[in-house]
Structures are given as structure tokens and as C-alpha cells.
């Protein structure tokens, strides 16, 4: 009977070993079916780059700056040399921007494939189909300080002179004063044309007639000239009589 027991013991040992081997192979097969070839949906990647402000040391502004990926879905911080790394990002398309209260940076779109390939391009909200490639890792350069306020305009004499109300009052006055001196008013045809043109402009009947004003203006000058001429002729005639 002891010999029978010793003969049954190796068979029992083989059965136990075969059961352990099968149980260890089943989890491996399940893991292989869900994970694929090692790069699957659950894999995460990182976005790298560097932010630069021309003429300013990184230590002067990086403490208040942040790196935002798709708003605040992923947040990164800048190192002392201006470089940054944002971890744990799945494949997809993301807008990466450096946010700083003192400097402005243009956003960049980064496309990550399922195999981990990176492609960076400008963000164009107007022409979305236009693609302008950028080097990767990202090199984000500041375009200057942001303009939070509009500069207040200073008052000048040109603003006063170019006011429409001032121009409406000054220009007619200049025309009435300078035009008789420039144009030959002794010509009756020229005077008649000027009166007709001014009457065409004077569409409001409540205002005084411009032609009457021009006639009085020119007639006063002509009468003054004639009176001065007659006085001169009278004096010359009196001299001759003497």
C-alpha cells in the first residue's frame, strides 16, 4: 500500500503544477488583448517647450507665469531657464498658451497622434484650414507687454480747428473776407456769376439774401472808387481854372 501511495504522489504533483501554469497564463492573455502593442488609448504624453521674453531675464517674470493646455485642463510651470514640460496628456489636439500678467504670448496648437508624434502650428481662428508649421519642442517668444488700457489722447489746437462746428463758422467768414480781394470785382460778368452761385448755396429763405450782400459790398467799393475819382477830377479842374 505504501508503494501505491508513492506511485500516486508524482501524478498528484504533476496535476498541481499544470493547474498553476494555466492560472498564470490566463491573466497575461487578458492583458495582451486589452493593451494591444503597448501604445493604446490609456497612454499619456508630454508637451515640451521654452518661453522667451527678449531682453528680460527669466527670473524676472517666470514666477507669475503659467502654461495652460486647453484652458485649465492641464497646467504647467516654468523652470528657471524658461523651459516647461506638461505631463499626463492624452493624444489629441490642444491649444498651448503661456499666461503672464506682464507679457503677452501667442497661443500655439499642438497635435499629438496615438503613436506620440507631435506637430505644432499657429492658431488661426479666422482661417482654420490654413496650417503654418512650427518647430517642436515649442519656442514661444513674447510679443511685448499687454495693453490693458487705451492711452488717453491729449488735447491740441488741431483738434479745436478741425472741429466741424468751428469749420462751419470759420470757412464762410474766410470766403466773405478773402474772396473780394482775390477776385476782380469790377468785372460785372464775374460779379453776376458769383451772385448766382451764392444764391444756389443759400437754400434757407430765412437767411438774408447773399446776392444783396454781395451787391452792397461791391457797390460800396465801386462807389468809393468813383467818389474818390470824381474828387480827384474836381480838384484837377479847379486847379486848371485857377
Swiss-Prot record:
GO cellular component, one term: endoplasmic reticulum membrane
Localization per Swiss-Prot or TrEMBL: Endoplasmic reticulum membrane
Major localization class: endoplasmic reticulum
Annotated keywords: Endoplasmic reticulum, Membrane, Signal, Transmembrane, Transmembrane helix
Signal peptide region: 1-23
GO biological process, one term: protein insertion into ER membrane by stop-transfer membrane-anchor sequence
Gene Ontology MF terms in the entry: carbohydrate binding
Membrane topology category: Single-pass type I membrane protein
TM helices/strands, residue ranges: 160-180
Cytoplasmic-side positions: 181-242
Topological domain spans for side Lumenal: 24-159
Biased composition (Low complexity): 219-235
Function comment: Part of the endoplasmic reticulum membrane protein complex (EMC) that enables the energy-independent insertion into endoplasmic reticulum membranes of newly synthesized membrane proteins. Preferentially accommodates proteins with transmembrane domains that are weakly hydrophobic or contain destabilizing features such as charged and aromatic residues. Involved in the cotranslational insertion of multi-pass membrane proteins in which stop-transfer membrane-anchor sequences become ER membrane spanning helices.
Protein family per UniProt: Belongs to the EMC7 family.
Subunit structure, interactors included: Component of the ER membrane protein complex (EMC).
Protein name per UniProt: Endoplasmic reticulum membrane protein complex subunit 7
Organism: Homo sapiens
Organism lineage: Eukaryota, Metazoa, Chordata, Craniata, Vertebrata
